[in-house]
């Protein structure tokens, strides 16, 4: 069979077809391939099934390389694509779309807008006025499916193969060579899957179905344009036999900031030597027979998330920095760190990190950064490009950061979801304080549908079937972004009323990362759990109330 290319197409209902375009014969050779484990409406509508076979969350590494083999291969570019109005409707003919990108934004450029258009609603849900649904139910008539397909060639020296979807709106299922790989919700955090058992040497076929609405859509009622698609980069990656799975950089200071203690808590799979170089100092340790990996707080177990465990070993390195150059928006000092993994003296993997040293705390009624009062002069920022929607280029992100700095803005709230990691990297480097916000907003359940705050409508409240789905979103964000010095505050989300689950989220943040504060504006609306937020804020305050407060 000739080399598979973007002209290869796959998957029809429960079955898969590979069409290999023969340039010389100008025709298609069709190979039938059954597709196992089709996604059902019941799965999409179940709030307790929000991920299947998704790997444990971990820190984002901007710089991870190996001299032996390429660790990451980008799948960005043109993909084969087709579209259906719902799970039972017929698919369109095959077309091509660009990844990353939104289906509806690209549909605008095609005659007749065949894949729909962006849809703006504020506090309502996008199905309001079309179908009457209760929380967890999903539209039956209009719930479009975007089916993406492309081929890839497995590098000869890869012993393992993983897939990373950096952003899929709002749910995605993955197959490789017709074999079901996994399922994910939570639009704005990465989902990783192990495809090693499904791939084979040479050419492979990858299929991703993206569903516009799922049960998680009830948790994503942000005031923005509603769209769907693979809107952030898609990557394949492999892991060397000795691999850094995760790292959490922690720090503490002498009371007068004359010295800092910096600890690198690493999780490593495989056996060999782990070496950390930081501030001109080097430490190393041997790792041998690994212990079973426990990712700590685990949400979505059982059917929703089968045990996905890696054999890893914990190892920590602690350094002392005398007279540290502290990080702030005015002076965003960054130290470089390198974590090298070696076996018998040969370098297996290198990970570079930039570390900002700062202490953020609440004393009395004041927030202090490095012992001094801090005032946020900030903005709420949606990810947005007028041409591509929430698929924002690196050039556009840099333009945003430079213009914010030029206008004396020093803080950004990632309203109302985790931003692209590159934007956070820029905030580290240029100096912007960040409130990292969980991908959670249920405005339409409590303000429009459940105005009395009843449990029948309001999400998440204390409803047990939604608890793990909500808490997993907090975990995914924290684990990905925990090493960014720019992030000073974790946010529990936006306009989701109140209740026990939000309080549990705030406690998870404090327990896992006591170096940051926790914010949730919604305690102003629901005082049942006031400890959910470390500080109180209020949106849309009338001018008269502000004058009264300042008097």
Where are these regions (language model features)?
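Extended acidic/polar, glycine-enriched regions
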Residues: 199-203, 265-361
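Accessory beta-strand-rich segments of carbohydrate-active enzymes
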Residues: 32-39, 44-51, 62-66, 80-84, ...
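Short strand-turn-strand beta-turns centered on an Asx-Gly dipeptide
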Residues: 175-181, 279-280, 344, 370
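Short, positively charged and aromatic/hydrophobic N-terminal segments
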Residues: 10, 17-21, 26-29
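Substrate-binding/catalytic cleft of secreted carbohydrate-active enzymes
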Residues: 402, 411-551
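Aromatic/hydrophobic beta-strand junction motif of beta-rich domains
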Residues: 165, 262-268, 371
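N-terminal carbohydrate-binding accessory modules
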Residues: 248, 338-404
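Conserved, mostly hydrophobic/aromatic
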Residues: 178, 234, 335, 371, ...
């Amino acid at each position: 069979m000739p080399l598979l290319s973007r002209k290869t197409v796959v998957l029809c209902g429960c079955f898969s077809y590979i069409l290999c375009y023969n340039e010389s014969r100008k025709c298609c050779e069709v190979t039938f391939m059954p597709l196992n484990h089709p996604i059902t409406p019941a799965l999409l509508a179940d709030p307790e099934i929000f991920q299947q076979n998704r790997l444990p969350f971990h820190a984002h590494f901007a710089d991870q390389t190996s001299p032996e083999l390429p660790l990451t291969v980008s799948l960005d570019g043109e993909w084969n694509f087709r579209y259906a109005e719902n799970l039972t409707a017929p698919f369109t003919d095959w077309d091509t779309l660009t990844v990353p990108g939104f289906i509806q934004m690209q549909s605008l450029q095609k005659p007749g807008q065949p894949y729909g258009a962006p849809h703006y609603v504020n506090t309502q849900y996008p199905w309001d006025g079309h179908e009457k649904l209760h929380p967890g139910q999903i539209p039956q008539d209009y719930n479009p499916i975007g089916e993406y397909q492309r081929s890839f060639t497995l590098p000869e020296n890869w012993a393992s193969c993983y897939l990373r979807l950096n952003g899929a709106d709002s749910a995605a299922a993955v197959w490789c060579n017709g074999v079901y790989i996994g399922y994910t919700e939570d639009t704005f955090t990465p989902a990783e899957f192990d495809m090693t058992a499904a791939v084979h040497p040479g050419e492979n076929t990858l299929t991703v179905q993206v569903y516009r609405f799922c049960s998680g859509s009830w948790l994503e009622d942000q005031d923005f344009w509603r769209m769907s698609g693979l809107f952030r980069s898609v990557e394949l990656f492999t892991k060397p036999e000795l691999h850094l799975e995760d790292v959490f950089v922690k720090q503490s200071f002498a009371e007068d900031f004359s010295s800092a203690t910096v600890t690198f808590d690493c999780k490593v799979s495989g056996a060999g030597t782990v070496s950390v170089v930081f501030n001109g100092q080097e430490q190393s340790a041997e790792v041998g027979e690994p212990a079973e990996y426990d990712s700590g707080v685990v949400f979505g177990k059982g059917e929703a998330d089968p045990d996905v465990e890696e054999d890893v070993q914990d190892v920590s390195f602690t350094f002392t920095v005398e007279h540290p150059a502290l990080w702030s928006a005015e002076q965003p000092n960054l130290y470089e760190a390198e974590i090298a993994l070696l076996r018998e003296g040969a370098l297996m993997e290198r990970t570079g990190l930039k570390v900002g040293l700062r202490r953020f705390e609440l004393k009395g009624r004041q927030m202090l950064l490095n012992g001094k009062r801090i005032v946020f002069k900030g903005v709420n920022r949606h990810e947005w490009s007028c041409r591509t929607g929430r698929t924002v280029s690196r050039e556009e992100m840099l333009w945003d950061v430079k213009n914010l700095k030029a206008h004396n803005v020093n803080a950004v709230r990632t309203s109302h979801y985790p931003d692209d990691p590159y934007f956070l990297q820029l905030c580290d480097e240029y100096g912007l304080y960040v409130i990292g916000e969980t991908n959670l907003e249920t405005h339409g359940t409590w303000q429009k549908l459940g105005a009395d705050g009843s449990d029948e409508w309001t999400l998440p409240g204390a409803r047990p079937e939604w608890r793990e789905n909500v808490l997993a979103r907090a975990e995914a964000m924290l684990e990905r972004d925990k090493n960014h010095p720019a992030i000073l505050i974790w946010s529990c989300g936006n306009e989701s009323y109140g209740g026990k689950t939000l309080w549990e989220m705030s406690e998870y943040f404090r327990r896992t990362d006591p170096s940051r504060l926790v914010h949730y504006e919604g305690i102003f609306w629901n005082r049942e759990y006031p400890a959910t937020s470390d500080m109180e804020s209020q949106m849309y305050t009338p001018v008269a109330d502000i004058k009264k407060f300042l008097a």
